[in-house]
């Protein structure tokens, strides 16, 4: 009799586990592995702002309330690898960095596509900005004119971003010199493409791009350690007060990503907020 009862219990347990996995190898009762970008990342700053993942101290100071249990990654590439190798992970990155190794979920029923970003339906969007000083070199000014031109706009659009600048037609001045660019790993892919195409028209110009994060890029521009700082977040007033100006060059979306085995197709903004605050711990608990 005891053996029979034990056998029944075992069969029920196996059946429950099988059902919870939804025949896909994904167990909804497992804990969510929260993955975030590092502090200083413009993508993290924009993500926290867009999903309102903030709290206040008793003195009223606002701070990033991302759970302390989140795993931290230093780049979009590491984020992709981390989520693609963990069935229960959730992360976020630039829409333009998406690939087939992971899956982007819809937010509030809207897919993260360039068209949805452009028409305003996808709300999880941010600006790509550059930080520069007024006293730029002639060659740096020329490169920015190129970015603003119809050529620059076309490159930005073809690369999957939303162009926002409208400048004059670009005519090369055949300048020479070096331009140093530093900052966001999210902005760097489009900046590298723009730089490559610009140098084809201006063979005596060398553009050197160093990838770090938004805060480092902005600080480098302020300190004169680079000509152009790249930022995937809004450049705040305290930074602008240090002698730089902000130029928006494109718009991009932030996609929330999960493992390909994950059965979740859509998340509400409030669910993402709860997950990243550490209030929602298991996939099965998502409301």
Q: Residue locations for each model-derived region?
A:
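Exported/periplasmic ABC-transporter solute-binding proteins
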Residues: 4, 21-287
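C-terminal motif of bacterial Sec signal peptides marking the signal peptidase cleavage site
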Residues: 16-20
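Positively charged n-region of N-terminal signal peptides that target proteins for export
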Residues: 1-7
């Amino acid at each position: 009799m005891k053996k029979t009862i034990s056998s029944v219990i075992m069969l029920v347990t196996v059946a429950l586990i099988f059902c919870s996995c939804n025949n896909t190898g994904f167990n909804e009762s497992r804990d969510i592995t929260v993955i975030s970008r590092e502090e200083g990342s413009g993508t993290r700053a924009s993500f926290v702002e867009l999903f309102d993942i903030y709290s206040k101290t008793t003195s009223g100071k606002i701070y990033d309330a991302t759970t302390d249990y989140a795993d931290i990654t230093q780049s979009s590439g590491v984020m992709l690898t981390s989520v693609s190798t963990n069935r229960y992970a959730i992360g976020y990155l630039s829409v333009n960095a998406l690939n087939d190794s992971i899956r982007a979920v819809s937010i509030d029923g809207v897919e993260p596509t360039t068209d949805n970003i452009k028409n305003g339906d996808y709300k999880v969007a941010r600006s790509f900005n550059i930080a520069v000083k007024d006293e730029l070199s002639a060659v740096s000014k020329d490169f920015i004119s190129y970015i603003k031109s119809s050529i620059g706009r076309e490159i930005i659009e073809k690369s999957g971003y939303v162009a926002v600048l409208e400048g004059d037609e670009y005519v090369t001045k055949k300048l020479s010199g070096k331009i140093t660019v530093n900052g966001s790993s999210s902005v760097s892919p489009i900046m590298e493409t723009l730089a490559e195409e610009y140098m084809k028209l201006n063979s005596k110009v060398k553009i050197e791009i160093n990838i770090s994060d938004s805060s480092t890029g902005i600080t480098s521009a302020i300190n004169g350690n680079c000509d152009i700082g790249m930022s995937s977040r809004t450049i705040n007033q305290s930074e602008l007060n240090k002698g730089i100006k902000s130029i928006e060059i494109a718009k991009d979306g932030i996609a929330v990503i999960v493992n390909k085995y994950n059965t979740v197709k859509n998340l509400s903004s409030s669910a993402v907020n709860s997950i990243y605050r550490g209030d929602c711990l298991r996939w099965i608990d998502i409301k």
